């Protein structure tokens, strides 16, 4: 379990990175920590992994206070950063054995554990090749596997799929999802909103060092409160006609790439009926008309402000 209560962090020079951050992650669940660059995600991970000291507040990881019991916290966690921590000149197997030895396993235990992880992570075919020859997806696999050599109670994943192709990203998703079945608590930061939607049991959104939303992805979508009516014409040439017919709707959006027109549906089904009537009067044929809730991407944009640039 992870708990933060009123955590703040101010760096030298008075730069405030976190302000009154509070949230919790139950044992065996996956929480996605979202925010723009500079929102405080990496600082939060740094505090929870004892790399940084909080200026105020309390943080508990796996039952241990990060300030009073840092050694116990470190013994309970695994951390995978944005850059791979493995030695690219060693084989995958050699890396896992090395990490096992560094974590206190005897040589035989380290070899046995390495073999278990190689099989679990489907790396048998590449285990005895140097990591230098691995694809980006394979490097992320071996990196995550290394953080699990001694099974942690809590695993921190800092943007685990950045730079990966879609197939490799989904492979990593499958690996991360399997961890909750092993009662591992996972806190991950990510720039990919789809990733958070697919993987997470809960989502925490940071903006300028503060928590602006905390809940499941579905709860956040519902809490945002807006629903829109989206239509798709049979003939893309009708997009302009649809826009003209619905011109009095505030917030109308035309997406020519997706062949859709969307308007806010403040009255729900009544709005959908009004849209359908207007387009029917103009003899515009549709392939689809529906009420839709916002995506997690739209929720994120709604709740956060762009970072201030100099």
Sequence positions of predicted segments:
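Non-catalytic surface loops within mature trypsin-like serine protease
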Residues: 13, 27, 125, 235-236, ...
